[in-house]
Amino acid sequence: MQIQFHLYNTLSRTKEVFNPQDQANVKMYVCGPTVYDNPHIGNGRSGVVYDLLYRIVIKIFGEKTVKYVRNITNVDDKIIDRAELLGVTIDELTDKVTKEFHKNMAYLGCMLPSIEPKATKHTDVMIAIIERLIAKEHAYVVDNHVYFDVLSAPNYTELSNRSLEEMFEGVHVENSKTKKNPQDFVLWKPAKQNESANMNFESPWGLGRPGWHIECSAMSYKYLGENFDIHGGGADLIFPHHTNEIAQSRCAFPSSTYAKYWVHNGFLTVNGEKMSKSLGNFITIRDLMDKQIQGEVVRLFLLSSHYRRPLDYNDKAIEDAKKTLDYWYRAIENINVQKIDLPHDFMQSLLDDMNTPLAVKIINDYAKGVFISKTEEERQLNASAIITCANFIGLMNKTPHEWFNSGVDELYINEFVNKRLEAKKQKNWLLADQIRNQLLEEKIILEDQPDGTTIWRKE
């Protein structure tokens, strides 16, 4: 019996059975970062959500049949402004932020995509698509700008499910006097005076650079063709970015439907408020790394809520994720765990539109099972289910010893343990107790063994 994966499609606003156009060639595109500043925790949520989706699709169809493209936007007005502010070159900024993004994704346990194209390497494809749009009268040139004619696009509002007036209400519109319609968006913009040369490119319309939306249309076309299966991104990209991608791609290639399934993850807030630098609650993934919060803790936090629902970052949520992982790691401690087939109920939770809260509950139930098991065989089966399920969603990639002692200076602690053992030999109980209490203040628990040795663990 074929596995049925139900996935919510923003385009149809329903959960649909995922049926790729070619099961031997499943194609997935996700909007990657604009590399002007260090990625924030919201970017991390997107990275983890689509990493999980990638893992599920691989499980169903096989690793060699799935192509996952995630782009790098390295040409943008924000990049120019940020480089100027920092007094660095465009390349210095984008290279540094791209490397930071890769470190952040590794920290969160995300697999590498199949292909990670950079926008600046694909301006030829962008120009070719823009020329097609002009030829088909879906785009026009004004003062060296090329604009897309929104009113020429059939079903422009389909993805957002709002009227044109609602979509543009309160939206700042640039160069509205030179456009046919105020809603028309830029496909190509001319270079500004004194701008960095490596941010502009030769084109039939003069030196300039692409608009944001055409970049993703071009890179998805280059690597996945006119039609592909999944397009993912944050809910904030539904309009204008994804709406404009659909419009320009379908108009450039009239026989194309572009992406079949549109998947969007929900917003992330911080302590109940929208994340904003002006509010002082802007949290980067680097901030979490510098606090020595383990990546698995952040990943579990990001998976703790259904991907389409809002998620609030706060200290308690991180603390709860840490306690949960401690519980799971404690459950498999000193048990000979083995990889087994993914339990049916766990897999079914993920096949139901990636229901990660239910998946996490199921792992918790297996952990409880370990502690109430009456036989060693039952304990081993529950522990093996924990590690198999957790590994599948990118968690529990350490041994319990590595987990509980992460960030601890083992040489420092072992030195005190040995001093305490020596004190006990000399019956200096006062010193032995002082050492135990000192380590306890540092959240290190000592456990004396029947054979006279002492083991330690983090609280």
UniProtKB/Swiss-Prot annotation:
Principal location: cytoplasm
Residues given in the record as ATP binding sites: K277
GO cellular component, one term: cytosol
Reactions catalysed: tRNA(Cys) + L-cysteine + ATP = L-cysteinyl-tRNA(Cys) + AMP + diphosphate
Swiss-Prot/TrEMBL cofactor(s): Zn(2+)
Protein EC: 6.1.1.16
Keyword Nucleotide-binding: yes
Subcellular location per the Swiss-Prot or TrEMBL entry: Cytoplasm
Cofactor binding: number and manner: Binds 1 zinc ion per subunit.
Placement of sequence motif 'KMSKS' region: 274-278
One GO BP: cysteinyl-tRNA aminoacylation
Binding site for Zn(2+): C31, C216, H241, E245
Pfam families, per database record: tRNA-synt_1e (PF01406)
Broad class of enzyme this protein falls into: ligase
Xref: InterPro entries: Cys-tRNA-ligase, Cys-tRNA-synt_Ia_DALR, Cys-tRNA/MSH_ligase, Rossmann-like_a/b/a_fold, tRNA-synt_1_cat_dom, tRNAsynth_Ia_anticodon-bd
Complex and partners: Monomer.
PANTHER family: CYSTEINE--TRNA LIGASE, CYTOPLASMIC, CYSTEINYL-TRNA SYNTHETASE
Similarity annotation: Belongs to the class-I aminoacyl-tRNA synthetase family.
Protein name: Cysteine--tRNA ligase
